[in-house]
């Protein structure tokens, strides 16, 4: 980052780098309600988020029995295109996928049956996507409950999810589905970031209901596809949190999340990924924002997106 401004917050003091208008722009993909389509918000500082296009739907879902678009995750791929995956249903065994060169013109939507091989699988929730430099492939991962697969925790929640994944290079051919993470409890909403070479951090939700957890934790690995170590203590407070997504500004990591019982968004921050400070009162999002993903675009891409005529 070439130019920075410093914003100071007291009790405790937090210093963040704010990008000027000539640099990249932060975007946040999200859904509203039960998942009517893709919405986008933008920010220049990572704190104040405004709805793009008057909070209009950018893309409507067309795949899956329920035609939902929940938990939209967008990344810029190694090919320069934007790749998006999302939850299509509460109870189907597949996920949605589409790509775009500019967030305006989208490919035909695909239904990817990632858990079709498991006859008892209940769902495929909150998929995320990462590019793996080691495998030279995209890794797509999500949460699924398979009744009886982990009987020791079957009675501790409404479902009993674990994190699974597939890999692909072309979004036409996919690897066999494999288990990505088994932390010893009901887990959903995993998202992974590369910290440095050969070090990855997974943010995840402990979905345990008995006793109630409903918090976010982290686990580390030397590889994107694991194995990941034992999860740490909660990084969120005495509220229910889910749907983490992560942005690094300068040396500060910011984790945004859905405080879904309070119908608002929250955030925590850290410089060392070990000690976390709640800054929920420092961030603002469009009303009704739900679980999504933060990513960056160039100012030129953003200007083109703002000026476009969106036809969902």
State the predicted function of each range.
Residues 17-312:
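Carbohydrate-active catalytic/glycan-binding domains of CAZyme proteins
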């Amino acid at each position: 980052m070439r130019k920075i401004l410093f914003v100071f917050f007291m009790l405790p003091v937090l210093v963040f780098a704010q990008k000027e208008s000539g640099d990249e722009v932060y975007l946040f993909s999200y859904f509203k309600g039960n998942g009517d389509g893709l919405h986008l918000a933008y920010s220049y500082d990572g704190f104040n988020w405004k709805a793009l296009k008057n909070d209009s739907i950018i893309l409507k879902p067309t795949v899956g029995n329920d035609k939902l678009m929940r938990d939209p995750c967008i990344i810029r791929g190694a090919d320069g295109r934007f790749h998006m995956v999302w939850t299509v249903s509460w109870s189907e065994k597949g996920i949605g996928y589409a790509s775009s060169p500019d967030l305006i013109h989208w490919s035909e939507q695909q239904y990817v049956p990632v858990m079709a091989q498991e006859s008892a699988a209940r769902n495929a929730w909150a998929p995320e996507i990462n590019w793996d430099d080691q495998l030279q492939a995209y890794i797509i991962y999500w949460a699924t409950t398979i009744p009886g697969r982990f009987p020791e925790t079957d009675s501790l929640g409404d479902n009993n999810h674990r994190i699974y994944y597939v890999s692909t290079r072309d979004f036409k051919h996919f690897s066999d589905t494999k288990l990505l993470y088994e932390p010893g409890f009901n887990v959903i909403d995993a998202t992974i970031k590369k910290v440095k070479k050969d070090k990855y951090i997974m943010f995840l939700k402990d979905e345990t209901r008995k006793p109630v957890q409903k918090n976010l934790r982290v686990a580390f690995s030397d590889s994107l596809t694991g194995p990941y170590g034992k999860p740490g203590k909660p990084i969120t407070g005495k509220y229910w949190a889910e749907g983490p997504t992560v942005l690094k500004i300068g040396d500060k990591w910011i984790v945004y999340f859905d405080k879904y019982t309070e119908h608002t968004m929250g955030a925590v921050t850290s410089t060392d990924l070990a000690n976390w400070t709640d800054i929920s009162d420092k961030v603002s999002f469009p009303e009704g924002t739900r679980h999504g993903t933060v990513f960056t675009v160039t100012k030129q891409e953003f200007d083109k997106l703002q000026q476009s005529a969106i036809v969902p």
